[in-house]
């Protein structure tokens, strides 16, 4: 199957800050790359030991929380959705609505980079559904289907 054309090659942190309302410590993606015309793209999260979550998860063996990976998927999907409709619609917010088929496969450790491979699996008016695979070094560490709503 032929890949659809790239609409946005690289969205850096400055552009993400203009696109999403999330801020530190709850902005959980560092950039989004390869947003395609088929509403797919890849979010990137560089996991640092300095993240607040590692103070309690877990002090003796730090593991990046799975729920934060799911939120990272949702934030990536939000950027893809908003950027995909820019110019035709002007959404001001995106709300995370559903999580389905969520699985955590391997732990993510400080120093690793997570890539959130998101692709649209459906859209109806302002509702979007995405399937996501979180990968570290090409290996799936988590997966889920997420739903979101773009609002004006």
UniProtKB/Swiss-Prot annotation:
Keywords: Cytoplasm, Lipid A biosynthesis, Lipid biosynthesis, Lipid metabolism, Lyase. Its EC number is 4.2.1.59. InterPro entries: FabA_FabZ, FabZ, HotDog_dom_sf. It is an enzyme of class 4 (lyase). It is found in: Cytoplasm. GO terms for cellular component: cytoplasm; membrane. The keyword Lipid metabolism applies. Pfam families: FabA. GO terms for biological process: fatty acid biosynthetic process; lipid A biosynthetic process. The keyword Membrane does not apply. GO terms for molecular function: (3R)-hydroxyacyl-[acyl-carrier-protein] dehydratase activity. CDD domains: FabZ. It catalyses: a (3R)-hydroxyacyl-[ACP] = a (2E)-enoyl-[ACP] + H2O. It comes from the Bacteria. NCBIfam families: fabZ (TIGR01750), PRK00006.1 (NF000582). Involved in unsaturated fatty acids biosynthesis. Catalyzes the dehydration of short chain beta-hydroxyacyl-ACPs and long chain saturated and unsaturated beta-hydroxyacyl-ACPs. Belongs to the thioester dehydratase family. FabZ subfamily. This is 3-hydroxyacyl-[acyl-carrier-protein] dehydratase FabZ. It comes from Bradyrhizobium sp. (strain ORS 278).
